[in-house]
């Protein structure tokens, strides 16, 4: 799946009930990650130009609205994750005003509900991640004590987390562990 440190910019998956595959809507800088880390065909990755970023009143969703209109989807019901981080009221207004003939609905955490169902492969990776996390916590209890420099303790913890297990390599975390 798409995995990038780009959640703070406008991006979305566009899923049409009759489309063979979803579309991935991302900024130009993040398109490479979408091409590499998803199974989507290049034409299913919709890239918006950097000129849509911080160029008020232009907004990336202006381009998204154009795409929806080009595909003749502008008179359909459109579900939005209204309680999604970084999906602002301004984003909502851009879509609602740009698609006045559509019915805009809150799909109420639909993505999270779909993500609840895990494949056997996902469960295997989650168990491996839990093992690595447990190793990291054990190392934290060993490394942290009065008089030990914070950087030295963190170095040992990070080493453990990134080293992983003999079967599964670790990785850096998406945010700094606190």
Tell what function each PLM region has.
Residues 1, 86-87, 133-178:
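Active-site cores enriched in adjacent His and Asp/Glu residues with nearby glycine-rich loops
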Residues 1-135:
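A composition/biophysics-driven feature that prefers long, compositionally simple stretches
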């Amino acid at each position: 799946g798409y995995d990038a440190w780009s959640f703070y910019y406008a991006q979305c998956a566009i899923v049409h009930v009759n489309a063979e595959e979803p579309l991935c809507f991302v900024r130009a800088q993040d398109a490479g990650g979408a091409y590499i880390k998803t199974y989507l065909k290049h034409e299913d990755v919709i890239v918006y130009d950097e000129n849509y970023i911080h160029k008020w009143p232009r907004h990336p969703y202006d381009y998204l609205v154009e795409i929806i209109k080009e595909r003749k989807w502008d008179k359909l019901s459109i579900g939005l994750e209204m309680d999604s981080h970084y999906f602002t009221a301004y984003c909502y207004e851009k879509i609602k005003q740009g698609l006045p003939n559509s019915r805009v609905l809150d799909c109420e955490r639909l993505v999270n509900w779909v993500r609840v169902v895990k494949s056997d492969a996902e469960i295997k990776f989650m168990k491996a991640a839990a093992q690595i996390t447990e190793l990291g916590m054990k190392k934290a209890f060993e490394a942290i004590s009065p008089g030990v420099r914070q950087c030295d303790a963190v170095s040992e913890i990070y080493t453990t987390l990134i080293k992983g297990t003999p079967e599964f390599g670790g990785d850096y975390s998406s945010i700094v562990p606190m």
